[in-house]
């Protein structure tokens, strides 16, 4: 099937894809056509950033759908959030993002509602209304995710 990818310059690229293709595959096809490395590509559909390991079918992207390509500038900051199971989630943030926004990004990737998340960095629990910059969170920083169970006391 054909899909379209629209760049910020307004250029539209046509790609031949299968619904079983992963977002990684799509980024590789964009690289073949446009020479943009996949790690600099962010694909958006229906207002959501598409995750590399997922397929077009996962996002209900059908023939003649239009994806939007945004370039990740070097200034975008990649951090990791480590869960209690040891799983590491990579998240692309801006220094001005609030902790609440980072929790929303965790929810997008893992399905955990922000109200159940406690993020810890440098031994401190992070307040929702503060920014990454307030806590000196920068590229490569690792935050720890602890789940807050309803009704119980969260003892760390």
UniProtKB/Swiss-Prot annotation:
Ranges for domain Ubiquitin-like: 1-76, 77-152
InterPro entries, alphabetized: Nedd8-like, Ubiquitin-like_dom, Ubiquitin-like_domsf, Ubiquitin_CS, Ubiquitin_dom, Ubiquitin_ubiquitin-like
Cross-link (Glycyl lysine isopeptide (Gly-Lys) (interchain with K-? in acceptor proteins)): 76, 152
GO biological process entries: ethylene biosynthetic process; protein neddylation; response to auxin
Chain residues in the propeptide: 153-156
Signal sequence range: none
Sorted UniProt keywords: Cytoplasm, Isopeptide bond, Nucleus, Repeat, Ubl conjugation pathway
Statement: the UniProt record of this protein carries the keyword Ribonucleoprotein: no
UniProt KW Metal-binding keyword: no
GO molecular function: mRNA binding
Superkingdom field: Eukaryota
Pfam families linked to this entry: ubiquitin
Any single Gene Ontology cellular-component annotation: cytosol
Gene3D superfamilies per UniProt: Phosphatidylinositol 3-kinase Catalytic Subunit, Chain A, domain 1
Functional note: Ubiquitin exists either covalently attached to another protein, or free (unanchored). When covalently bound, it is conjugated to target proteins via an isopeptide bond either as a monomer (monoubiquitin), a polymer linked via different Lys residues of the ubiquitin (polyubiquitin chains) or a linear polymer linked via the initiator Met of the ubiquitin (linear polyubiquitin chains).
Family from the record: Belongs to the ubiquitin family.
Additional observations: Ubiquitin is encoded by 16 different genes. Ubiquitin is generally synthesized as a polyubiquitin precursor with tandem head to tail repeats. Often, there is one to three additional amino acids after the last repeat, removed in the mature protein. Alternatively, ubiquitin extension protein is synthesized as a single copy of ubiquitin fused to a ribosomal protein (either L40 or S27A) or to a ubiquitin-related protein (either RUB1 or RUB2). Following translation, extension protein is cleaved from ubiquitin.
Name of the molecule in the record: Ubiquitin-NEDD8-like protein RUB1
Species for this entry: Arabidopsis thaliana (Mouse-ear cress)
